[in-house]
Amino acid sequence: MAEQLRFDGQVVVVTGAGGGLGKAYCLFFGSRGASVVVNDLGASFKGEGNSTKAADVVVNEIKAAGGKAVANYDSVENGDKIIETAIKEFGRIDILINNAGILRDISFKNMKDEDWDLIFKVHVKGSYKTARAAWPYFRKQKFGRVINTASAAGLFGNFGQANYSAAKLGMVGFTETLAKEGLKYNIISNVIAPIAASRMTETVMPPDLLALMKPEWVVPLVAVLVHKNNTSETGSIFEVGGGHVAKLRWERSSGLLLKADESYTPGAIIKKWDQVTDFSNPQYPTGPNDFLALLEESLKLGPNDPGEKVDFKGRVALVTGGGAGIGRAYCLAFARAGASVVVNDLVNPDDVVNEIKKMGGKAVGAKFSAEDGDAVVKAAIDAFGRVDIVVNNAGILRDKAFHNMDDSLWDPVMNVHARGTYKVTKAAWPYFLKQKYGRVLNTTSTSGIYGNFGQANYSAAKCAILGFSRAIALEGAKYNIYVNTIAPNAGTAMTKTILPEELVQAFKPDYVAPLVLALCSDKVPKKPTGGLYEVGSGWCGQTRWQRSGGHGFPVDVPLTPEEVVKHWNDIVTFDSRADHPEKASDSIEKIMANMENRVGEGKSGAAENEHLAAIKKFTGVEGKGTEYTFTERDVCLYNLGIGAKRTDIKYIFEGNEDFEVVPTFGVIPPFNTEMPFSFDDIVPNFSPMMLLHGEQYLEVRKYPIPTSGRLVSKGKLLEVVDKGSAAIVKQGITTFNAETGEELFYNEMTVFLRGCGGFGGQKKPADRGASTAANKPPARSPDAVVEVQTTEEQAAIYRLSGDYNPLHVDPAFAKVGGFKVPILHGLCSFGIAGKAVYEKYGKFKNIKVRFAGTVNPGQTLVTEMWKEGNKVVFQTKVKETGKLAISGAAAELA
């Protein structure tokens, strides 16, 4: 048996420890020999009120079990007093767990300064104050352990949490810097993104999911990270909850390198955009790219193809910090491209304004601090009547080693960078919403992304800006407001203080501006919002998260730190199981996939053989028929459900001589067909919540399709593929006319079952011709494009054709699945796309799609079609996000 991890003789400080995760930390460390400082203000999850009771209850519980503990009731912004309690009571401080937090969730358009400031006071400044107070003791004793707390909302952004997302991602940059500064003193710092029930989350998680999100699933990971045995895992980011533990790291694309001269234009970048986002040969960095080497390579290249000119005529661009350096370069570039420019600078905007006017452009100055965002934006409105583009560039440096950092260095950096970015964007937001157009370009830095010595304040602020950007990108997408973030490498007034002059000259701001203009244009071809890009010296690349495959622990057995240690390599190794999460629901999905991982229900080798035997038994065996009766009313309802309008008489009026049903209706009759097998028979750990509809294939075996009648569908199992952590099940269903016996439709449905693999089944799916064809779109512009805007009621109408899954109508159920709102049925998107193909090219004998992403009712579906002989290859995108909803799709014409 593994030796128990103990904390005897050590002192642990836990903030926000009156309940939930904080309480679980305290009880654990108290039981493992540590002396515990239980800090809790006793406020509500919104940060209101205070009470000493919560901390006292936890202290008494620890003492009753024979442990040592003391309560502290200070707010975390008085972190020095919290650490003082540890020193006075126990004489030392070894481990600091910054867990205190509040929520002030509200849509960005309705957010008030108080909502922003309170979140930052508790999450960001509180973590800084406690860590700063503990740091001298850590350095002196050459031992310290820090855990800071981020969240999925911080890592990916989340609706209604612009403040919280910013604060939580700020913790990542802060932690990375502490890790770098502390390493030589054996001060280990890590950050976790926990999914755990607490006073905060009880208002936003359904009760059944809350029950599975016990804080006890988080504590063992933290125990391993703060134990004295951990001397190397530092500056790391972990996702944890519900038995799932994984590590995240930054992944940087190989990017696009162009010649850094006057031919380096926005159009040149856009023309080769695929290279910007090419992750085929990625880097896994802990700091900036080698820009000197890139600059040398860039200068060897020939002139760039300028591509399509980016035109900003009629647009108003506001640039903060626009009076010098990189901000000046932005202002001049926008002016040259036809924009009216608002030059914001606290010191001197006038020189740049005059420079623009001298070259025939339009510009006004706005001499305000970025913190006075209302005044900055008012200057744009007063001068030009509108604002279209905001580039948040203003910044200051107050660098100092963390042990010398104080509030006079921390607060100004946080105020100018994070709060200034929030204030200017917030002031512009109502205008963006009204005109249904806005472009925001925010500025992080490699210090924020990766941390940097002497820049704990700057790193936290810059990473917070990225979290803020990701959250408002989600909120703005439906209003055509795009938000992106760059980490520029250029010589500026700020960097002059830390770079030699010759390097400052080499890293011209002119080599950053083209990407800024590209991102603020309407020309970015894929995923035009929510991106993070590094740029400089003629190079630009995208940076994203990579997540390890991690390890899933059984949810019916208490998790211990010793068990975490046993599986540590699985948790931290980035192998073929690694993926690239993009949204908060990607965290929930991993945790939900682990919910059926139970020792008590585990399958032995014999049981696995039972699954294989069941697959063999049921494959190809046809089930008894399931009847489906439909009328012209059902035809009208289906057509309306996939987007038919009141003007489409032949789809909605049974009295029309051309009355018909769209051929994709063929997926409806077999929908509830009784199959001759159950999923429990053929795969382990089956749960309906783990089922994803992967692909759909439909053959229309007889035209014209009747508009009423009695049909019978018979189904059979075609194959089961074992993907290790999941299973793929393919079913075939034939639909007959009950009166004549004629075959009308044949469907193949492919479902993906998370957590149901590993039973020793076949590893690769069979080639089944048209139903499994890859259908890669040709490398040319589409031959036809059809846009259909869905309504917010689309799913509510479509479900009446037979798919009553509450995921598509019940907000509470959708939230359990990790979605902000009920999503559109995949087969509804299939119908909309199939209708586009049918109306453009006529009858098809078969149609196949792969479901590549979700669609929210109200979003616009864009179907792009390429005719290749008798085959129409197509794909369907969500216009508002640029993401694919349907891929690998084609229809063979009849």
Swiss-Prot record:
This protein's domain notes: Contains two SDR domains.
Pathway of action: Lipid metabolism; fatty acid beta-oxidation
Subunit details: Monomer.
Keyword terms: Fatty acid metabolism, Isomerase, Lipid metabolism, Lyase, Multifunctional enzyme, NADP, Oxidoreductase, Peroxisome, Repeat
Main localization of the protein described in the UniProt heading: other
Organism: Neurospora crassa (strain ATCC 24698 / 74-OR23-1A / CBS 708.71 / DSM 1257 / FGSC 987)
Statement: the UniProt record of this protein carries the keyword Isomerase: yes
Reaction equation(s) it catalyzes: a (3R)-3-hydroxyacyl-CoA = a (2E)-enoyl-CoA + H2O; a (3R)-3-hydroxyacyl-CoA + NAD(+) = a 3-oxoacyl-CoA + NADH + H(+)
Protein name: Peroxisomal hydratase-dehydrogenase-epimerase
Bridged cysteine pairs (disulfide): none
Pfam families: adh_short, MaoC_dehydratas, MFE-2_hydrat-2_N
GO cellular component, one term: peroxisome
Family in the record: Belongs to the short-chain dehydrogenases/reductases (SDR) family.
Residues annotated as domain MaoC-like: 776-887
Function: Second trifunctional enzyme acting on the beta-oxidation pathway for fatty acids, possessing hydratase-dehydrogenase-epimerase activities. Converts trans-2-enoyl-CoA via D-3-hydroxyacyl-CoA to 3-ketoacyl-CoA.
Gene3D superfamilies for the chain: Hotdog Thioesterase (3.10.129.10), NAD(P)-binding Rossmann-like Domain (3.40.50.720)
InterPro entries per record: HotDog_dom_sf, MaoC-like_dom, MFE-2_N, NAD(P)-bd_dom_sf, Peroxisomal_Beta-Oxidation, Sc_DH/Rdtase_CS, SDR_fam
Lineage: Eukaryota, Fungi, Dikarya, Ascomycota, Pezizomycotina
Positions contributing to (3R)-3-hydroxydecanoyl-CoA binding: H693, G694, K723, D803, N805, G826, F851, G853
Positions of the UniProt region annotated as Short-chain dehydrogenase like 2: 311-523
